Amino acid sequence: MKQPLGVILAGGRSTRMGGGDKGLLDLEGRSILTHVIERLAPQVADVALNANGDPARFSETKLPVLPDSVAGHPGPLAGVLAGLDWAAEQGADTIVTAAADTPFFPCDLVPQFLLAAEGMEHPLALAASRDAESGKLWRQPTFGLWPVALRDDLRAALNDGLRKVVLWTDQHGAATAEFPVLGIDPFFNVNTPQDLDVARSIARNGQ
């Protein structure tokens, strides 16, 4: 399998942060998005950003900005589709997605995805981590390995009104790549001002 392309999902509307782009918030002198790029870029062949609105606000990243092709802010699956369409233009077979507000995700994200999806005709996998208290396994719908071969199926599902990521991935027998929780959940994301304070504390401690 060719090395996947990377797509950072930044299409959310950040309502709990008062609007704006969570990825552009400062985290120890750099934007959260910069932290995400630095973790994802070494693991993939190239990186693009899924975001809506004026792409100029991301100009410092020097990344291609891919808007949703489905109207109405339908959620992460629209960003996945935008990434798959971009990947098809690049001649790639798969993409790996990461969320723009999740700065501490695993540095072995892509290898673990490829391992989990080994042998699948259309490699498809979601990340997961286990709740430290309850032991429940939580899938992470914005962190996934997605095959270009299923992009037309995804487009049709979105046009039919499907919005929930796991409904679509379950239809196609997605694998699960489980990542350990070592001190903090690696998929901790910044949704509120309080989360940002926690993220700054984690970053200061060298996560």
What is each of the regions a protein language model found here?
Residues 1-165, 170-186, 193-207:
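Nucleotide and nucleotide-moiety/phosphate-recognizing core
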